[in-house]
Amino acid sequence: MPVIWGGGHFGLDWFFVDWKTDVPEMEFAHINVKELMTVLIAAFKWAPCWVGRHIVVRSDNSATVSAINKSTSRSQDLLPIVKELFWLCVKFDFKLTAIFIPGKLNILADHLSRFHSVDSVFEAKSFLLPSVFDVLYCKFHMSYNTFHLLQSVWEPICVP
């Protein structure tokens, strides 16, 4: 099954991406590219908060973990993303490492990557209470198109 969503969190802040809606050119990209691109999105979003810190990425994708820890990749598809991560680390003075954690144990990130599912929204609620159900708050964590695409799924559980 192709990976069509991604997500990440830092503290209580989070994001969700629908590759087809938000980044159409990534819709058919390899899973390794999407997994590493999710880390890059997180770095762009939170790098200013990471100044002087050691950030540990938890991923269930071994290619992502390896590329981050080695700061390189043999994959020509991953290498530009790794380089961009490297320059963000330099620009914002943070250290980035990664550890492998099976998706079932990386609970919040796993639920965020499946945020289209009502069950995953309810599971994420336990980590992000109460604001995950505030419609206005949700709009800040995903694109306009993705928000409206998912709104029909959320309608029974979101509070206006």
Residue ranges and their predicted role:
Residues 25-27, 86-90, 128-132:
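Short C-terminal domain-edge/linker segments immediately following a structured domain
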Residues 94, 104, 111-160:
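Flexible, low-complexity interdomain linkers flanking nucleic-acid-processing modules
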